[in-house]
Swiss-Prot record:
Active-site feature positions: E81 (proton acceptor)
Organism: Arabidopsis thaliana
Record PANTHER family: AIG2-LIKE PROTEIN D (PTHR31544:SF2)
Gene this chain is encoded by: AIG2LD
EC number assigned by the record: 2.3.2.-
Induction: Down-regulated by biological and chemical stimuli.
InterPro entries: AIG2-like, AIG2-like_dom, GGCT-like, GGCT-like_sf
A single GO molecular function term of this UniProt record: acyltransferase activity
Domain of life from the UniProt record: Eukaryota
Name by which UniProt lists this protein: AIG2-like protein D
Pfam families given in the database record: GGACT
Expression sites (tissue/organ): Expressed mainly in leaves.
Length: 152
């Protein structure tokens, strides 16, 4: 009996764009490609250092796609994103190539009318201001899930 291994792709647009965060969670860095998710907006969230996306016509979110994500890794990402996000299937445009369209998964903020969403979240600002503390939190999260130790 041969088992079929399902591989997934996941569009990430926040803290998971940082290789160090992904390495702590998956114990590896998957193959990636830059991508854009049309008709969504990336918001900051009051009191949080990570972003949320919700549908927004005529807007787009830049991020990247993680390729070759296993079922187990997808479960880890589901746990990491928690109940505040819903995993949804979306279509992104790969920006490294010829704007190829790709069906993929992403995590959308569950509460679409959340009054705590505001402005636009900035990855570069997050890296400078919050990444160090976020890595510490992510490492603790990985340890709680008994994930394999990363080199970080």
């Amino acid at each position: 009996m041969s088992g079929t291994v399902t591989m997934h792709s996941v569009f990430v647009y926040g803290s998971l764009m940082a290789d160090d965060v992904v390495r702590l969670l998956l114990n590896r860095i998957p193959q990636t490609a830059s991508a854009t998710l049309p008709d969504f907006h990336r918001f900051s969230i009051k009191g949080r250092v990570y972003p949320a996306i919700i549908p927004a016509k005529s807007d787009k979110v830049s991020g990247k796609v993680l390729f070759g994500i296993t079922d187990d890794e997808l479960n880890v990402l589901d746990e990491f994103e928690d109940v505040e996000y819903e995993r949804e299937n979306v279509q992104v445009l790969l920006t490294d190539s010829s704007d190829e369209k790709l069906q993929t998964k992403t995590y959308v903020w569950a509460k679409k009318d959340d009054p705590d969403l505001y402005g636009t979240w900035d990855f570069e600002e997050w890296k400078q201001l919050h990444m160090e503390g976020f890595l510490k939190m992510t490492k603790e999260f990985a340890e709680e899930l008994n994930l394999p130790k990363s080199e970080i």
